[in-house]
């Protein structure tokens, strides 16, 4: 998907009131941590693992991937311009610009927007003005569309949190469907503790069911990440 900046855009019209109310649900954080239980499946395999996630707002995203018995298989480090991945099982590492994320998700984005996505917030794109489309299935539907992509969001009318979102890449025939469930309160704001993500990339289909646990907000974190001298650099990594 073409790169979409998260620059501020002037909101107007009926969509503005719903978007502003939705983004009022964003927690005020500098540091965020959670353990995410992941059930993953695609055309070829199914596996369960845990992702330990740590973030510093607008600065860094760190993920430790852990299998059964807490055995760590790899780590991911994302900065504002780069992504680094190490696979401890194969002794390999990857180093790429942040645009590499488009291989993992049908969206090419910047770090602040990726953090908003992980936290379950309404996404803003500077090259597509949002438009309110009325009620659909008793949910407020907002659409942002450009020649390259379309972002459909459905908001609960009670508190304007996200119920569903669909991000479609028209150019590459990719689509991501996300549902948001099990809302609780974190730092006085609504937070979705359970997500279901379906991704279609050409003939490939994958699903991830996420359950957020052990959430910590504004506790100072560290982000240990070391590429060992014996590790081999590769162009792509699969765990």
Predicted regions and their residues:
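N-terminal leader/targeting segments and the immediate start of mature chains
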Residues: 1-46, 236-239
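Edge/loop elements at the starts and ends of beta-strands within beta-rich repeat scaffolds
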Residues: 24-32, 43-47, 54, 58-59, ...
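Extended beta-sheet lipid-handling architectures
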Residues: 31-36, 48, 64, 78-80, ...
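Hydrophobic lipid-interacting interfaces of membrane-associated proteins
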Residues: 39-41, 68, 185, 202
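An acidic-aromatic
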Residues: 61-112
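C-terminal low-complexity, charged extensions that often adopt amphipathic alpha-helices
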Residues: 104-107, 115-135
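Gly/Pro-enriched, hydrophobic low-complexity segments
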Residues: 130-239
